[in-house]
Amino acid sequence: SSINVRKVLWACEEIGIAYTREDSAPEMALNPNGLVPVMVDRDFVLWESNTILRYLANKWRATSLLPTEPSARAEVERWIDWQATEFNTAWRYAFSALVRRNPAFDDSRWIEASKADWTRMVGILDDALTRHLYVAGDSFTLADVPIGLSVNRWFMTPMDQPSFPAVTAYYDRLSRRPAFLTHGRNGIP
């Protein structure tokens, strides 16, 4: 159910990369943080999901997902980074409380603050999506992988949510992609 693992699996399917998934202690030990995902490509070991996304797109020359033109690439990378630094940070507490039911996240004030910040982030995304079909323009890019999974978490979390029509339309567009149905909109928040 890890959003970070699902990012990598979704990207592999979009790019057409064959992979073997291994969920064992030796693989987790390759990451000094003890977390997944960890990618092993021959003798090269890489961890951090968004870095893995970029590596795969670069290695497989998936320029439709990660453009080479500097401003187009920067737009994609900005949204990838925004997902990791702003969007994830906003939803982490509320999601841990409301979906994972983690007792370490039971402070109602923090839950409400996280929900408010999360809603604000979805509003930022909704505004961007009123101008484009996807987050970095009118074509699906690598940025839509982490953002799409975060949007899935938004819709799967049991809480009151204001209407964000552009985000809803985006979620429906992503749902036309088989890899998103496998790794995103699959009943797993």
Regions from the language model: what does each represent?
Residues 1-112, 126:
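GST-like domain detector, emphasizing the conserved glutathione-binding G-site
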Residues 21, 138, 163, 183-184:
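A generic structural-conservation signal
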Residues 57, 150-151, 184:
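Active-site-flanking alpha-helical
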Residues 83-178:
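GST-like fold's C-terminal all-alpha helical module
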Residues 180-189:
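Terminal-tail/helix-coil boundary detector
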